[in-house]
Each structure stands twice: as structure tokens, then as C-alpha cells.
């Protein structure tokens, strides 16, 4: 018997399922910094969110992170944060498993593509359910980053 690492409330939302068992009865979910299995019968699929997504995205080489919670904030390890302003969400017209995000401020701009696909973080050996490709533009030029995202409760 496996140990219980956490619990999902009966009304929990934004539960990120990153993998499904072969028999499709169990889903691997992230709870904070750990992953665990939950019985899929207790979860309901929501393909297109009805509220703004709150995401934390990150990648390596260089180590970077991005907070997407109403506003976009981008940071490279040991560097200053780049405030990118309010986020505009653009849903795909022909797919429910991807979307684009756009943000612009006086300090920089963001164009990001978020996709619902398994993504692995090689530094933590954790699986995530969302991948990201982000183009960041600032006074220093433009740079393209790829990585993983997770839902923020």
C-alpha cells in the first residue's frame, strides 16, 4: 500500500493530470512539489477553462521561470525580474488543448504557446501536463525559451 501524500478537496479545481494509467483508472497529479495517483472516477474533464489560467512555467539552460497570474513576470536565475504586464489569452480556433498568451509592458513583451502535452523537467525528474514555448522581447533583444508549466491552485 502506498502512502498518502496529500488530498484533493471534493470541490478542487485546476487539478493537473499529467499521466493516466494503462487501465485509465488512475491519474498522476501534481500536488505542490510532489506527484501522486488519484482515482480518475472522482475527476471531471474540463477542456477549455472558464476562468483565467494561473500558471508557473520553468525551464533549464539557462534556468528560467515565469509566473502567469493575471500579469506575466519572467525571471532568469540570478537576474532581475522582467515585468511583462497583463496577459491576453488567445484560444485556438480549432483545438481545445492549446492556447496562446500575449503580454506587453514598457520593459518587454511575451508571446507564449501553451500545449496540453506531457513535459518532463530533467532537473527534478517530475512530469508536467503542460509545455510552453515563449518568446521574450526586452531592451536587450529577443530570446526563445522552452519548458514546462504547472497549474497554480
PLM features: what roles do these ranges have?
Residues 3-9, 38-40, 77-94, 113-114, ...:
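Short amphipathic beta-strand/extended segments with alternating polar/hydrophobic composition
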Residues 1, 71-77, 130-134:
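Short polybasic amphipathic segments
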